[in-house]
Curated annotation (Swiss-Prot):
Protein's name according to its UniProt entry: DNA polymerase eta
Zinc finger (UBZ3-type): 701-737, 798-832
Keyword DNA repair assigned: yes
Record has Manganese as a keyword: yes
PTM entry text: Ubiquitination enhanced by nopo.
Organism: Drosophila melanogaster
Length: 885
């Protein structure tokens, strides 16, 4: 075993008490808790795959009693147990989502953590607890009389090698009276230095069983889930004991019963020996059971295997496991995977990118959640995949450092790893088809490190990523005021909103003053009349432009459009909320100006409709957004980004400001946003780019085609394509013929049922039938049957073109009757020839048995005479064709 885990010293190998808590049918219990009506009923949890009812991943004990097992299909379970309840695993990102089961496992772990700090979660439904400290404390209390074991604490408790827990307790009680009663047996099996720990082994395990009962009771009370437990001196023995008595039971594995258990325990049942390493051990040592390893010395095992694995095998065969219970409340890695069996193999680059995106999205979400809960970050990523190379499945695993945590970076890293470690990634001559199909794909991250309190880069990264997602989805512009409000928590919402509008209007005044440069009234501008504000100036310019030039305002300026700001001000007016004097006056002016603009646009709408087509196109290019009244009538929604750009252009046109020239780099959209848009588009319509679903286009300019006479389709003018197309039509014609034949046969069978049954005929025996076993009467299907007269048909067919066959009584068309009769003649001839040959061979064999020492020539003559004699009784095929009608 090559693992970098902590270990205890060899001197303390029998001092520990380790407890394994294993949840009973955990997935089924989670479903029963969510659906109480499923309790006490056969239940199974199935995967999302709908083929044959889905794959079963968990079965409760009521369904197991009916023969239902894991890895069955849902339909098979229904056949064995019709009343079974099949619960579907939630499906997210086109794969199973087990988040609710992980959350339930964390709920159980929170209860277990109260009993000891040495808690190691092995999986969603398993956890190791080192309760040595608790056992030592209770041993001291027992010696002082402050603690005593009670029978009710050992309910549903079993001990390996003992009929009942009472026998095990009696043995421990007798040993208290005579502590050295088993020393002779112990000295033969254990080292002299280990005898004190061996003598106290059983009582320590019994106290551990009482602690296990308390743990299981607490889990049941606080979570509602039932669990089993195994109590032993190390992790491997505790896991073995936990599975011996289930459900809702606990088992003690005494130290002295380990050897007898290993004598009949297969090697694969030991943790760490269930895979390829266990197979290598069995083949190398020629063993089957774990107890057979004891006969090998440590040196032999180290020579056959490496030093570390040899020592580990030597110890575990004697029930010794030095691996410590490492405190691990959280998982060491976060991963997700998906299989693609059969026709679902990934054969296209677009398909691979899609599924890498789905897996990366789940990894990203779980990393973000894990950081919030556990304050840690992953530094390592592993990509696992299985390829179909020349008909064989080749599994590969590649790893790399993980620096960025967004979905795009994980997809890019995963794809680069697969490309770099595949000899030929794309099929020759193609840019989108994979050379080797992928049957399995998985991504996992690990090597977590705790983030210090002063390190906030990761948190900022997730915040920026969330903001980027909001911008892509269009939610960011509406959230800008909210961000400003969150920065100033002491101010009220009303005050902040009014201050925002006041600052906005003041900024608009300054921009208008800069754009105009010199006012229309220089004296007034020089005097700086305080009563003339920005709104009045704009209204004056607007009326002057409409009156003198007759221009039509095609779009409302961005400052006064009936947008979020004006709607908010109207709402403030209706509700009666009072703001500052400046904001109230500006809001009234803005509302009044907006109403006048709408009226002007309504009056000039007819003139606007009479404009030429070129002017309409020019106006639509200049002003991308319509007035609010027109957009509401059309019932169309506009993109917020497009609206902002168009209003900005209108502002430049109306105020006369020359927009600044932008470079090519500035004109390009945001790289991050463009990449996220590509990801979103690939997720939505990735199936359209599947290589395996691509239909080749027939280019008539390169390959000439001819028209099919039957279906009118254009076919390439080549021999192979023509023959394939003709075979297609022939197959269709043959299928139609077979269907018509089947319909005729069904019709004839119904007619036969309606006819009256004919009385059976008595068979006539020939006079010489008893004289020889070979001179029998001709069979019923002989050639002579062809010349016999047949009785007339009792009932004529309804179709005058049909006649009844004298042989098979079937109604055949008159046109097809000669061919049908030839079939019967040929069949009867074949049967006659086969029977004739059989009689000849049988007679020859019998005569050889009677006279085995006859000379070769004489036996040949007799064989020829036998053939001539046997054939004289029946007509030969030559005689049949030579006789006259």
């Amino acid at each position: 075993m090559s693992s970098a885990r902590s270990h205890v010293s060899m001197q303390n190998k029998y001092d520990r008490v380790v407890l394994l808590v294993d949840m009973d049918c955990f997935f089924c219990q989670v479903e029963e808790k969510q659906h109480p009506e499923y309790r006490n009923r056969p239940l199974a949890v199935v995967q999302y795959n709908p083929w044959r009812g889905g794959g079963i991943i968990a079965v409760n004990y009521a369904a197991r009693a009916k023969g239902v097992t894991r890895h069955m299909r849902g339909d098979e379970a229904k056949d064995l147990c019709p009343e079974i309840v099949l619960c579907q695993v939630p499906n997210i990102r086109e794969k199973a989502d087990t988040s609710k089961y992980r959350d339930a496992g964390k709920e159980v772990a929170n209860v277990l953590q109260r009993f000891t700090q040495l808690l190691e979660r092995a999986s969603v439904d398993e956890a190791y607890l080192d309760i040595t400290e608790t056992v030592n404390h209770r041993m001291q209390q027992m010696q002082s009389g402050a603690f005593a074991l009670q029978p009710q604490e050992l309910v549903n408790t079993f001990a390996v090698g003992y009929p009942s827990i009472g026998d095990y307790v009696n043995k421990i009680t007798n040993r208290f009276a005579n502590p050295y009663m088993d020393d002779e047996r112990y000295q033969m099996s254990y080292d002299q230095n280990d005898l004190p720990a061996v003598r106290q082994s059983d009582i320590r395990l019994l106290i551990g069983a009482s602690v296990a009962g308390e743990v299981r009771a607490a889990v049941k009370k606080e979570t509602g889930y039932e669990c089993s437990a195994g109590i032993a001196h190390n992790k491997i023995l505790a896991k073995l004991a936990a599975g011996m008595n289930k459900p809702n039971k606990q088992t003690i594995l005494p130290l002295t019963e380990t050897a007898s258990l290993f004598d009949s325990l297969p090697v694969g049942k030991i943790k760490g020996l269930g895979g390829k390493f266990g197979e290598v051990v069995c083949e190398t040592l020629g063993i089957k059971f774990m107890g057979q390893v004891v006969k090998f010395s440590e040196v032999d095992l180290q020579r056959k295997f490496d030093e570390k694995n040899g020592t580990w095998l030597f110890n575990i065969s004697r029930g010794i496991d030095l691996e410590a219970v490492t405190p691990r409340f959280y998982s060491k890695s976060i991963g997700c995977c998906k299989k693609f069996p059969g026709r679902n193999n990934i054969t296209g680059l677009k398909t691979l990118q899609h599924w890498l995106g789905e897996l990366s999205s789940e990894i990203n979400d779980r990393l973000e959640k894990d950081f919030i809960e556990n304050n840690r970050r992953a530094k390592h990523m592993v990509v696992q995949y299985v390829q179909d190379i020349d008909g064989e499945e080749v599994a590969s695993s590649r790893s790399t450092a993980l620096r960025d945590y967004d979905q795009e970076s994980i997809v890019r890293l995963s794809l680069d790893l697969i490309k770099a470690n595949t000899k030929t990634f794309l099929r020759p001559g193609s840019e989108s088809a994979l050379n080797n199909a992928i049957k399995f794909l998985g991504i996992s991250v690990g090597k977590f490190e705790t983030v210090s309190s002063g390190q906030n880069k990761l948190q900022e990264m997730f915040a920026n990523q969330a903001a980027k997602k909001r911008r892509v989805s269009g939610d960011e512009p509406g959230q800008l005021p909210k961000v400003e409000m969150e920065k100033k928590q002491k101010q009220t919402d009303e005050f902040k909103m009014k201050s925002f509008f006041a600052n906005y209007l003041q900024g608009a005044k300054k921009e208008d003053a800069k754009a105009d440069g010199i006012s229309a009234n220089p004296l007034a501008a020089a005097a700086g009349a305080p009563n003339k504000n920005f709104v009045e100036e704009y209204k004056h310019k607007l009326h002057a432009a409409v009156r003198t030039e007759g221009t039509v305002l095609t779009s409302t300026p961005a400052e006064f459009k009936e947008s979020f700001f004006s709607q908010y001000l109207k709402q403030q007016k209706k509700t009666g909320q009072q703001g500052s004097v400046t904001s109230r006056e500006d809001s009234l002016d803005v509302q009044e100006l907006a109403e006048e603009l709408d009226a002007i646009e309504a009056d000039n709408s007819k003139d606007f409709e009479e404009d030429t087509e070129e002017e309409t196109e020019l106006t639509s290019d200049t002003h991308m957004s319509k007035p609010e009244g027109q957009s509401s009538d059309a019932g169309q929604e506009q993109d917020p980004n497009t609206l902002n750009d168009s209003t900005g252009n209108d502002l430049y046109v109306e105020t006369g400001i020359v927009p600044p020239t932008l470079t090519e780099d500035e004109l390009k959209p945001s790289t991050s946003k463009r990449k996220f848009d590509e990801i979103e588009s690939s997720v939505s319509n990735y199936k359209e780019c599947y290589v395996e679903f691509a239909v080749p286009n027939l280019r008539t300019d390169i390959l000439p085609t001819i028209k099919c006479d039957q279906c009118g389709a254009n076919i390439p003018d080549e021999v192979k394509s023509l023959q394939t197309h003709r075979d297609h039509h022939f197959a269709q014609e043959l299928s139609r013929t077979l269907r018509s034949t089947e319909r005729e046969e069904r019709t004839q069978s119904r007619q036969k049922i309606s006819l009256k049954p004919t009385p059976p005929k008595k068979s006539k025996k020939t006079a010489g039938s008893g004289s020889s076993s070979y001179s029998t009467a001709p069979p019923s299907n002989s050639i002579t049957k062809f010349f016999r007269a047949k009785p007339t048909q009792e009932q004529a067919p309804s179709d005058p073109q049909m006649n009844q066959c004298p042989e098979c009584k079937a109604f055949i068309k008159c046109v097809d009757m000669p061919e049908h009769l030839d079939y019967h003649v040929a069949r009867n001839l074949q049967r006659e020839l086969n029977q004739q040959d059989l009689r000849t061979r049988t007679a020859a064999l019998n005569k050889e048995k009677i006279s085995p020492v006859q000379p070769k020539k004489q036996s040949q003559k007799k064989l020829n005479s036998t053939i001539s004699a046997s054939s004289s009784g029946t007509k030969t095929i030559a005689q049949f064709f030579s006789q006259s009608n």
